[in-house]
């Protein structure tokens, strides 16, 4: 039972396309669930955290904290 080269190429191309499509949607689903469970911190969340700690949040202090958190996350990813 011999299968021609053209059919093998077609099977491989279809397999690659199915794998890429499945991988894309799998990664997309994973990231959506991850962001739902671990939302990125926003300025409002930071403001409410500072108020709960008894601090009066100024805009300058908020931006300093946001920038330091962004810098720390960049260093963690390296």
UniProtKB/Swiss-Prot annotation:
Source organism, top-level taxon: Bacteria
Gene Ontology CC: one annotated term: plasma membrane
TM region(s), chain numbering: 5-27
Location within or outside the cell: Membrane
InterPro entries: UPF0154 (IPR005359)
Pfam families: UPF0154
Keyword terms: Membrane, Transmembrane, Transmembrane helix
Membrane-related topology note: Single-pass membrane protein
Family per record: Belongs to the UPF0154 family.
Full protein name: UPF0154 protein lp_2061
Organism field: Lactiplantibacillus plantarum (strain ATCC BAA-793 / NCIMB 8826 / WCFS1)
């Amino acid at each position: 039972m011999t299968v021609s080269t053209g059919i093998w190429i077609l099977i491989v191309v279809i397999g690659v396309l199915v794998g890429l499509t499945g991988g894309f949607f799998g990664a997309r689903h994973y990231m959506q669930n991850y962001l739902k469970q671990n939302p990125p911190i926003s300025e409002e969340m930071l403001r409410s955290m500072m108020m709960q700690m008894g601090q009066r949040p100024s805009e300058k202090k908020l931006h300093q904290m946001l920038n330091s958190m962004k810098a720390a996350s960049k260093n963690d990813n390296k």
